[in-house]
Swiss-Prot record:
GO CC annotation terms, alphabetical: cytosolic large ribosomal subunit
Organism: Staphylococcus haemolyticus (strain JCSC1435)
Transmembrane intervals: none
Signal sequence, renumbered to the chain: none
Subunit comment: Part of the 50S ribosomal subunit; part of the 5S rRNA/L5/L18/L25 subcomplex. Contacts the 5S rRNA. Binds to the 5S rRNA independently of L5 and L18.
Protein purpose: This is one of the proteins that binds to the 5S RNA in the ribosome where it forms part of the central protuberance.
Family statement: Belongs to the bacterial ribosomal protein bL25 family. CTC subfamily.
Molecular functions (GO terms): 5S rRNA binding; structural constituent of ribosome
Alphabetical list of SUPFAM superfamilies matching this protein: Ribosomal protein L25-like
Chain positions covered by the region annotation Disordered: 174-221
The name this protein goes by in its record: Large ribosomal subunit protein bL25
Length: 221
C-alpha cells in the first residue's frame, strides 16, 4: 500500500490563495468519509502522481493527515489540460472491510486471429463494474483476444474471474468483437465513379419552364 503525506489547510482560502498554492506545486484537496470529518488538505502534485501510477485509479492510499493515517481512495479529481495541472482532489476515507462498486478498465491482450485476416477489432465496453472490498479491487481486467476469429465476440460471461471480486455487468454484454472488413472501393473504381458523375448532364430547369410556357401560350391562342 502506497503512502502519501498531506498538510492540513487552515481557514478559508480565496481563489487567489489556491492559485498561489498550485503555483508552488501543491494541490488543494479534501478528505471525507468513513470515520473522519471533512478536512481541507494539500498534497504535493508530483508525489500524488507517483502514488496513482503505483496503485492505480482504484487503489488504496495510506494518507497522512496531521498525526493520523487514514485509508483513502481517490473519489474524484479535476485536471486543467491547458496548464497540464491537477487542480483539486477528493479523498474518500474508506472501511477496508466494506465492499464497494467501482469501474475497472478492460485491457485487451494479444492480436486477434481475425484481425490478421483483415477483420476489425471493436471494443464496445472499456470498463466493468466490479464489487469487492478495497484491497481486492483489481487495477484492471485483462481479456485475451488472440483466438478470436472474424464474427467472434467475447462477452462478460467469458471473463475468468481470478480474484475475490464480482462483476456486476450483464453477462451477455459484449466486451469485444471482431467484425468483417468493410469493402472499400479501389482507386480505379473511385475514378470510374467520378467519371460517370462528371459525364451525366444536369437537368436544366429553366428550359423546361420555357417549353411549358410556350405550350400554354399556344393553347390560349
Amino acid at each position: 500500500m502506497a503512502s502519501l503525506k498531506s498538510i492540513i489547510r487552515q481557514g478559508k482560502q480565496t481563489r487567489s490563495d489556491l492559485k498561489k498554492l498550485r503555483n508552488t506545486g501543491k494541490v488543494p484537496a479534501v478528505v471525507y468519509g468513513y470515520g473522519t470529518k471533512n478536512t481541507s488538505v494539500k498534497v504535493d502534485e508530483v508525489e500524488f502522481i507517483k502514488v496513482i501510477r503505483e496503485v492505480g485509479r482504484n487503489g488504496v492510499i495510506d494518507l497522512g493527515v496531521g498525526s493520523k493515517s487514514i485509508k483513502v481512495m481517490v473519489s474524484d479529481y479535476q485536471f486543467d489540460p491547458l496548464k497540464n495541472q491537477i487542480t483539486h482532489i477528493d479523498f474518500l476515507a474508506i472501511n477496508m472491510t466494506e465492499e464497494r462498486t467501482v469501474d475497472v478498465p478492460v485491457h485487451l491482450v494479444g492480436e486477434a486471429a481475425g484481425a490478421k485476416e483483415g477483420g476489425v477489432v471493436e471494443q464496445p465496453l472499456f470498463d466493468l463494474q466490479v464489487t469487492a472490498t478495497p484491497e481486492n479491487i483489481p487495477e484492471s481486467i485483462e481479456v485475451d483476444i488472440t483466438e478470436l476469429e472474424v464474427n467472434d465476440s467475447y462477452s462478460v460471461s467469458d471473463i475468468k474471474v481470478s480474484g475475490d471480486f464480482t462483476i456486476e455487468n450483464d453477462p451477455e454484454e459484449s466486451v469485444v468483437t471482431v467484425v468483417p472488413p468493410t469493402d472499400e472501393p479501389t482507386e480505379e473504381e473511385v475514378e470510374a465513379m467520378e467519371g460517370e458523375a462528371a459525364t451525366e448532364e444536369p437537368e436544366v430547369v429553366g428550359e423546361e419552364k420555357e417549353e411549358d410556357s410556350e405550350e400554354e401560350n399556344k393553347d390560349e391562342e
